[in-house]
Amino acid sequence: MAGHSQFKNIMHRKGKQDAQRSKAFSKLAREITVAAKLGTPDPAMNPRLRAAVIAARAENMPKDNIERAIKKAIGGDSENYDEIRYEGYGPGGVAVIVEALTDNRNRAASDIRSFFTKSGGNLGETGSVSFMFDRTGVIEYDADKASADDMLEAAIEAGADDVASSESGHEVYASQDTFRDVAKALEAKFGEARKAALIWKPQNTVAVDDETGEKLFKLMDHLNDHDDVQNVYANFEVSDALMAKMAG
């Protein structure tokens, strides 16, 4: 099992360790506050904030929590978070990118380096693996929002690079430069997306055996469970059997 669907499933496994809703909401609130602080507190005028709010809604985060996170930025009483990207190699030489928002750079770096080392991998310098990924925008819609043909036609017309449709929904990919315009065009036609964000999409994936795959999933679990970590991306694929086992 390769391609779009497994990449999506691997990236979205974070939902398993984020089952503790308070931890999930805390991470979402942190992104909302940072986005509002860096730009305008109006989601309609701030693409990053809008994406953060959409992500929060998709996780059923209460409206009050969302508004409180925005108000923290407006009030100026929020913590100062640094955006940091960590890059390294996990088990099997798999490339891993970690995006974090932290109020303590030393703590975050120490913890994340420890996770890599204990997994048999190593944390590298910025730029050590990101050249193997594309900074890409992804816009996701539920399957019932449009047929595969209608979504493909609309996406191409809007300037998207690629579309993947399945029973679980539609994933539209666009370059970093055209992403916002594509998202806006699709929203005008199909309504609000369930997700619209910039991601690190691997240019190619590496097939790993089940033993290595389990080690990689364990590393990703540790990373995703860290309070400072917002997103984790990796360029591997595993067998259908292991994917089903780890998702269950």
Swiss-Prot record:
InterPro entries in UniProt: Integrase-like_N, TACO1_YebC-like_2nd/3rd_dom, TACO1_YebC_N, Transcrip_reg_TACO1-like, Transcrip_reg_TACO1-like_dom3, YebC-like
Transmembrane intervals: none
Source organism (scientific name): Rhodopseudomonas palustris (strain HaA2)
Localization, UniProt: Cytoplasm
The protein's name in its UniProt record: Probable transcriptional regulatory protein RPB_4273
Segments of this protein annotated with the region Disordered: 1-22
Family: Belongs to the TACO1 family.
Keywords, sorted A to Z: Cytoplasm, DNA-binding, Transcription, Transcription regulation
GO biological process: regulation of DNA-templated transcription
Keyword Cell wall biogenesis/degradation: no
